[in-house]
Amino acid sequence: MLKRADDWGGPDSFPHMSCGWAVATDAPFKWTKQMAADFGGTRNGMVMHWPAGFEAKGEIRSQWHHVNDVAATVLEAAKIPPSKSINGVKQKPLDGVSMLYAVKDPDAAERHTTQYFEMFGNRGIYHEGWFARTIHRAPWEHEPRRALAEDIWELYKVDEDFSLVNDLAGSNPKKLAELEALFMEEAEKNQVLPIDDRSIERVNPANEGRP
């Protein structure tokens, strides 16, 4: 794989791998892509480079952020306000927040404090250092493990447990219930409901109303 790294993702590659290798390449996390309920499916490193704009060089930031923060960051750097209307169509407010504050101050309190995740019924919610999630199905499983309402939720303290290993659901049921309720609030606000947990059926154009 390393010998062909530059070809990965190009027209001569088929960038899929067996489940075992998928898990291995997502270390130190336990799950893979498609798993919205695990950082192995959602978490990636990010490099920010702006020689004319950043005094910090080669430093690490640990504030929690999401890909939806990129647009807000670019707009702030360019000193451009978000568009309120495009071609007469009113625009929704940006979900994300700019990350420039973290570049300027490594000790600044994080500003992206809540983020939901959902894919194929796998769900997760990050909130102020906590992460709750439920595994509805593995990527290689074509049927759910149980009904959505019967899924088992887990709870993790992200700033103390980077790899999501120590499930605190049993010792902190109040916090877990709080995050489960918050997930439903965020899901409703972002048009996630009703949750569609189908897999193979969703790639059938006839089911999606398109040719």
Region annotations inferred by a language model:
Residues P173-V192:
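A contiguous, mid-protein "functional segment" used to position or interact
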Residues T42-W50:
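Active-site-adjacent bridging/hinge elements
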